[in-house]
């Protein structure tokens, strides 16, 4: 996994996409890749991706997410970043964290991308104002594709500013397809 304290492992999947000098010239942006502490999560939940009754904390952010929120506001202040242009993206456990953060702190984010993640459907309605682009591989054996399908279905009923892309014949590594997307 990408957890730990080396400040490198979180760059394994997608890091080079954003770090390439040629890519950065196309975007006037700051990009951060926070690393989740070892043996912890981006959201406060006990996860069993194969059942629908994951146990979630309905209100509190995880310690990791609280630190991330503090970092975001610190960077906004220090670098004069437009607070209306803050976007979040996560894959796998980070996809869960993306949904959790947009559900509990929708005031922060202008948009979100969740790749092969899942959501707490009982509070996801709070994230409806944040446009989401949700990606998943149809053959994912780590996080069932149904998790993303359900999230998209719920969000779409509440607001039309959401996109869903499902990759045929693709397993958990759907981020490889995402980073190859022309529109991405």
Q: Where are the model-predicted features located?
A:
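Cell-envelope and extracellular/periplasmic
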Residues: 1-5, 76-79, 91, 98-103, ...
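Short, proline-enriched alpha-helix->beta-strand connector loops that line the catalytic pocket
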Residues: 27-29, 127-132
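Active-site machinery of serine-nucleophile hydrolases
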Residues: 2-65
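Gly/Ser-rich "nucleophile elbow"/oxyanion-hole loop immediately N-terminal to the catalytic nucleophile
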Residues: 45-92
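Primarily recognizes the serine-hydrolase "nucleophile elbow" in alpha/beta-hydrolase
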Residues: 73-80, 84-126
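C-terminal catalytic histidine-bearing segment of alpha/beta-hydrolase fold enzymes
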Residues: 115, 122-123, 131-135, 139-184
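Short, solvent-exposed loop/turn and secondary-structure capping segments
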Residues: 5-10, 42-47, 100-101, 124-127, ...
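Soluble non-cytosolic domains of exported or imported proteins
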Residues: 58-66, 103, 142-146, 175-178
């Amino acid at each position: 996994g990408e957890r730990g304290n080396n400040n490198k492992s979180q760059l394994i999947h997608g890091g080079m996409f954003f770090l390439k000098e040629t890519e950065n010239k196309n975007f006037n942006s700051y990009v951060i890749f926070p690393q989740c502490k070892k043996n912890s999560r981006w959201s406060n939940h006990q996860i069993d991706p194969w059942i629908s009754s994951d146990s979630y904390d309905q209100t509190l952010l995880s310690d990791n997410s609280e630190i991330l929120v503090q970092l975001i506001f610190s960077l906004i202040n220090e670098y004069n970043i437009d607070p209306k242009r803050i976007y979040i993206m996560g894959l796998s456990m980070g996809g869960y964290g993306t949904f959790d953060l947009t559900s509990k702190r929708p005031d922060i984010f202008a948009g979100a991308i969740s790749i092969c993640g899942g959501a707490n459907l009982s509070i996801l309605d709070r994230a409806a104002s944040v446009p989401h682009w949700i990606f998943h591989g149809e053959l994912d054996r780590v996080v069932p594709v149904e998790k993303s399908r359900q999230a998209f279905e719920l969000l779409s009923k509440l607001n039309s500013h959401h996109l869903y892309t499902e990759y045929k014949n693709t397993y958990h590594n759907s981020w490889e397809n995402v980073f190859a997307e022309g529109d991405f």
